């Protein structure tokens, strides 16, 4: 890369030049600080850093282009690796594993290639609001050791559309 290429990349708005990766909302709702999740594993960032979403919709979608890693047997959580190497973990609610799959329906499969917005899991929000300890849904990056900068966004988000996190590797 020559001097002019370097200067051009510094002043360009093109995401490819700046190396910024956007994570899009895997579900609709309101962004909440990860530290406010009523589970120490997420609040203390033991499994990674990120945000949580107080959900308003009925589906979880792929937040990045990539490959579905694991979908829990109870369909309440999934992992995905982005094409750029970001490993994400989306976990609906707290203690939702105890519902043994009630209120969740798997749409995607493990190992499936997905694009941003492709449905992964559908859920019954009224049922889960009644039965789960919390519906706050952590969205965390599990390979934080590879991340240089993490910018957490805030506000209301629309599933498959609104960015929730910006990352520089």
Swiss-Prot record:
Role noted for this protein: The phosphoenolpyruvate-dependent sugar phosphotransferase system (sugar PTS), a major carbohydrate active transport system, catalyzes the phosphorylation of incoming sugar substrates concomitantly with their translocation across the cell membrane. The enzyme II complex composed of PtsG and Crr is involved in glucose transport. It can also phosphorylate mannose, methyl alpha-glucoside and 2-deoxy-glucose. The non-phosphorylated EIII-Glc is an inhibitor for uptake of certain sugars such as maltose, melibiose, lactose, and glycerol.
Misc remark: Two forms of III-Glc (called IIIGlc Slow and IIIGlc Fast) are present in living cells. IIIGlc Fast, derived from IIIGlc Slow by cleavage of the seven NH2-terminal amino acids, is present only in trace quantities and has slight activity (only 2-3% of phospho-IIIGlc Slow) in the phosphorylation of sugar. Both forms accept phosphate from phosphoenolpyruvate via Enzyme I and HPr, however only IIIGlc Slow participates in the phosphorylation of glucose or methyl alpha-D-glucoside. IIIGlc Fast may play a role in the regulation of non-PTS sugar transport systems.
TM segment ranges: none
Marked site positions, Important for phospho-donor activity: 76
Alphabetically ordered keywords of this record: Cytoplasm, Kinase, Metal-binding, Phosphoprotein, Phosphotransferase system, Sugar transport, Transferase, Transport, Zinc
Source organism phylogeny: Bacteria, Pseudomonadati, Pseudomonadota, Gammaproteobacteria, Enterobacterales
Cofactor dependence: Zn(2+)
Active site: 91 (tele-phosphohistidine intermediate)
One of the record's GO cellular component terms: cytoplasm
Free-text remark on how the cofactor is bound: Binds 1 zinc ion per glycerol kinase EIIA-Glc dimer. The zinc ion is important for dimerization.
CDD domains (UniProt xref): PTS_IIA_glc (cd00210)
The organism of origin for this protein: Salmonella typhimurium (strain LT2 / SGSC1412 / ATCC 700720)
Pfam family membership, one: PTS_EIIA_1
Assembly behavior: Heterodimer with glycerol kinase (glpk).
Main subcellular localisation: cytoplasm
Domain notes: The EIIA domain is phosphorylated by phospho-HPr on a histidyl residue. Then, it transfers the phosphoryl group to the EIIB domain.
GO biological process: phosphoenolpyruvate-dependent sugar phosphotransferase system
Chain positions recorded as Zn(2+) binding sites: 76, 91
GO molecular function, one term: kinase activity
SUPFAM superfamilies: Duplicated hybrid motif
Domain PTS EIIA type-1: 39-143
Matching InterPro entries: Dup_hybrid_motif, PTS_EIIA_1_perm, PTS_EIIA_component
Keyword Transferase: yes
Residue numbers bearing the Phosphohistidine modification: 91
Protein name: PTS system glucose-specific EIIA component
Effect of loss of the gene: In mutants defective in enzyme I and histidine-containing phosphate carrier protein (HPr), cells lacking this gene are able to grow on the non-PTS compounds such as glycerol, maltose, melibiose, mannose 6-phosphate, and alpha-glycerol phosphate.
């Amino acid at each position: 890369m020559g001097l002019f290429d370097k200067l051009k990349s510094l002043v360009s708005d093109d995401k490819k030049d700046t190396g910024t990766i956007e994570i899009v909302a895997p579900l609709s709702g309101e962004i909440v600080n990860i530290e406010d999740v009523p589970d120490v594993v997420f609040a203390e960032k033991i499994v990674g850093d990120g945000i949580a979403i107080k959900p308003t919709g009925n589906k979880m979608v792929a937040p990045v282009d990539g490959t579905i890693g694991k979908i829990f047997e109870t369909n309440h959580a999934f992992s995905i690796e982005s094409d750029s190497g970001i490993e994400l973990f989306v976990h609906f609610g707290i203690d939702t594993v105890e519902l043994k799959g009630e209120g969740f329906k798997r749409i995607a499969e493990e190992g499936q290639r997905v694009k941003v917005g492709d449905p992964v899991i559908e859920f019954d929000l009224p049922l889960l609001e009644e039965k789960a300890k919390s519906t706050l849904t952590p969205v965390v990056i599990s390979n934080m050791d590879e991340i240089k900068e993490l910018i957490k966004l805030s506000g209301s988000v629309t599933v498959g559309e609104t960015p929730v996190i910006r990352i520089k590797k």
